[in-house]
Amino acid sequence: MNKQAVLSLSGGMDSSTLLLHLLADGYEVTCLSFDYGQKHNIELQRAKELVKYLNAHSRYEDEQYYAKVKHQVITLKGLDKLLNSALVKGGDDVPEGHYAEDNMKATVVPNRNKIFSSIIQAAALSIAEQKGKSCAIAMGIHAGDHSVYPDCRQEFRDADFEAFKLGNWGSEKVYLYTPYLLGDKFDILKDGERCCTFLHLNFDKVYAKTNTSYKPIKLKVYYNEGEDTVESEEWFSDYKSASSVERVEAFIKLGRKDPVQYADEFGPVTWEYVKEFVSSILENYEDAKTTNI
């Protein structure tokens, strides 16, 4: 395995799928996750769980080696106190509804991708110099992000990468890899299904180790252990915030049940209930667009 990549791994569905994509394409991957004070920091635990699962399943197959994934969580201590966003601790409530609605702009974290990309660029350039070969900067940004998050748009990514090239010697050894830039979450999930098949991975086990929810819910759960009833706390995804709506829509289109557990303020809910709720949001959004034409 010769190709190198540094991946921004949030623990969400998009970057987790891109990790599978890179492995299936023969990359050796260094994953960087960022703790910037996000409310939904369960995503960092999911990232760790996924990397652990993938490393346990690395092997030779058809003369290709799926190498162990390197992973590091970078803590940006104190950054949340400087940021105005519903996604960070101390910010406003995370809005609910369709992911294309204007109120979703409250979930923008100022300059987030620029902050992350600067660190990722530095790591990629260092790897390229150490190994004497080119290194990709991989990000799972996609078309569904463009209307809400300006730092996910092609023009920003191009300008940011140009600034990196201008500011560093040897930058020609690094290239930008954003295969989902023109696709949506459904396209990403389809690619994830393909990669799981290629890598002989269990799709449900992989995607159970991802978090897309901006409003995860911690609930007490009880299970039997022999004759005893054991109490535990587990994280559930919400199904009303925009990020969750977009994820559920992708699973509906793919015709698969989402393996993550969903809940609301009243407790756990079934996948059928989640599908029905999200379908109604999507229908209402389309009806509103038609009315406004």
Where on the chain are the PLM-derived regions?
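ATP/NTP-dependent adenylation/nucleotidyl-transfer catalytic domains that generate, transfer
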Residues: 2-3, 70, 75-78, 91-108, ...
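ATP-dependent adenylation/nucleotidyltransferase module used to activate substrates
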Residues: 1-200, 244
